[in-house]
Amino acid sequence: MSDTSTQAQQVALVTGASRGIGAAIALALAQQGYKVIGTATTDEGAERISKALSAFTGCAGKNLNVNDAAAAEALIDAITKEHGGLHVLVNNAGITRDTLAMRMKDEDWDAVLETNLKAVFRMSRAVIRPMMKQRYGRIISITSVVGASGNAGQANYAAAKAGVAGMTRALARELGSRNITVNGVAPGFIETDMTASLPEDQQKALLSQIPLGHLGKPSDIAHAVAYLASANAAYVTGQELHVNGGMHMA
């Protein structure tokens, strides 16, 4: 599993792939030759993925609620049967329910932990068996700088992402003997529609925290994921790769 021709035989599942970082990851993997299945929470989102990847053979968008364990397992089973295996899982789907802790409702906490932590566990658990059977796999989860440094108003999000980082290390120890690597990529501040709409003073305050002096792009995260999915990262497991322009140095 050492070159693009081999990657063309591999299948990658990317959750939350209809926009932003997820869309960039799906595109980067497709460009590397993977057959990419991207998920979205609506039929419209799934169709957007299919169109974005239409130039690449074997790629498609699928409608999936990652909180539906039965649906997730059914999709993974269908992928392995259709393509003969599943080689890369990228856990990217996530939500936010930001507010200060004193105002945070239980449902805000529960919703974020359910999608950003529990669903990552479920998806990862569901791919373990087929990956063990083929004695090869890459599980890559998108964490966050917030999970390492914290951020006011994001106690739920920080807890979930820190939990994913810990789970990544535990799974890496469990699965390493089966040639399955498990890693995380922790984005810092990335260019989005939201950051673009911030007032100038807020943008300057944001940039002042970043030694490189600019926001990251979704493609920066996608390239990190593509590396961890590749044969070049065969000896990398249990790691959280921070891609944040230096705003947090672990």
Model feature map: region roles:
Residues L100-A101, K105-L113, T195, L206:
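Substrate-binding pocket helix/loop in short-chain dehydrogenase/reductase
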Residues S2, S149-A152, A226, T237-A250:
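Short C-terminal tail/terminal secondary-structure segment
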Residues R129, R173-S177, A234:
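Alpha-helical segment proximal to the catalytic Tyr-Lys
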Residues Q32-I49:
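Conserved glycine-rich Rossmann-like NAD(P)H-binding loop of the short-chain dehydrogenase/reductase
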